[in-house]
Amino acid sequence: MSWHPQYRSSKFRHVFGKPASKENCYDSVPITRSVHDNHFCAVNPHFIAVVTECAGGGAFLVIPLHQTGKLDPHYPKVCGHRGNVLDVKWNPFDDFEIASCSEDATIKIWSIPKQLLTRNLTAYRKELVGHARRVGLVEWHPTAANILFSAGYDYKVMIWNLDTKESVITSPMSTISCHQDVILSMSFNTNGSLLATTCKDRKIRVIDPRAGTVLQEASYKGHRASKVLFLGNLKKLMSTGTSRWNNRQVALWDQDNLSVPLMEEDLDGSSGVLFPFYDADTSMLYVVGKGDGNIRYYEVSADKPHLSYLTEYRSYNPQKGIGVMPKRGLDVSSCEIFRFYKLITTKSLIEPISMIVPRRSESYQEDIYPPTAGAQPSLTAQEWLSGMNRDPILVSLRPGSELLRPHPLPAERPIFNSMAPASPRLLNQTEKLAAEDGWRSSSLLEEKMPRWAAEHRLEEKKTWLTNGFDVFECPPPKTENELLQMFYRQQEEIRRLRELLTQREVQAKQLELEIKNLRMGSEQL
């Protein structure tokens, strides 16, 4: 038998990492000097939040995504904690709400204004007080609105319901007290019905978060886990840590049987923590090492060998932390499937790195952009607390598309299109028709206008959007780079208009043929 590995066909074999140019990086950012093994960075389609240094307490910066270049040394901070900020996470269903936790044993919820900050933001929306020691991790529930999890150095995971009027919440909905040491990481499965944790006692636990009971526990001594991650709907866990020989290692587990890992792979002898990231849409796993500049990526499958190494992005600049852009914020026109924001403390720099699938065609690539989780919750807080589970509501990343799997929600939470920008120009009757046209056949607007007119207005609305961006709301370009970006957007818009014109011509020819057939049929009668 040949020693060469069996050839495996994959559409992601040639994925490569593309670092942003210098003018598209964020320079002179005072990144935290904390030694905790957290990401220290959170990203959404509007903002970058990064933990920073602040005298007399903890703070973090919220930088608009488009505000690249050198940061003003007096740029306003979000400050209000009495101790260092240890973790920040954006609300997945509200791009203007963020949670932070600190060494002062509190969690704070902040509402970020849509306009640029002109002075330090000190007024928080809610404060959560319940932990006896500092809080190291916060995590939002992936499908239920206003449910937040926090893990503290008191060895407890607390579940908070933010759907209340109180500004200071002193009692969590429930507390998970099964850990014997400091909790190092938390991860949810796709619908949020299971919680996986790693702990300083070297054990991986799969927990029912509502009951607080441990369903599975791994005490395998050959792998000391530091981070754990659910792998989508594969019913598997990926953990990173060290082997008994102190080599950095990744291990794959069956979530229903944590007695022995399905596979283990040693990576190198470095000492930095490995941060795992999984993209369920492409089944790709990214492993980012703290203290080095490399990003390894793999393809995950349900069948053996489970993990297939693709390649590695290499850089000389070591990262202290890392942020990840949600899928709805990616640039689909350049076939971008993942985007990292790398914190480089040696240069006080945040460097975006885009993972690109090389394609020759400029059209939308359906095969690499399946329906993905959007920015709308599929459950209310009370529904989840009462025992309901539901998968995320899916959206298409095609510019101008609508929800693909809508669920009825209470009247106070109207359904909206998460792919469109928050612009009042688009929140009109035409947008409502576009969002409802595919799945609400009883719409009053549809009754008042013919089907072809509704389709025409829907297509017309789509042409206003370039990669989910309203071309009429663009500010005039100030630099040569912005001018080039505007030029490429206009070229993409021209191409899309040509495609639309071709479709209209085909429809017109079909109508002419139908009319001709009807006339011939009437003459024969």
UniProtKB/Swiss-Prot annotation:
Pfam families: DUF1899, WD40, WD40_4. Residues 485-524 form a coiled coil. GO terms for biological process: intracellular signal transduction. WD repeats lie at residues 24-71, 72-122, 123-170, 171-214, 215-259, 260-305, 306-342. PROSITE patterns: WD_REPEATS_1, WD_REPEATS_2, WD_REPEATS_REGION. Transmembrane segments: none annotated. It comes from the Eukaryota. InterPro entries: Coronin, DUF1899, WD40/YVTN_repeat-like_dom_sf, WD40_repeat_CS, WD40_repeat_dom_sf, WD40_rpt. Gene3D superfamilies: YVTN repeat-like/Quinoprotein amine dehydrogenase. Keywords: Actin-binding, Coiled coil, Repeat, WD repeat. GO terms for molecular function: actin filament binding. One of its GO terms (cellular component) is brush border. Binds actin. Component of the N-Cor repressor complex, at least composed of NCOR1, NCOR2, HDAC3, TBL1X, TBL1R, CORO2A and GPS2. Belongs to the WD repeat coronin family. This is Coronin-2A. It comes from Homo sapiens. The lineage of its organism: Eukaryota, Metazoa, Chordata, Craniata, Vertebrata. The gene is CORO2A.
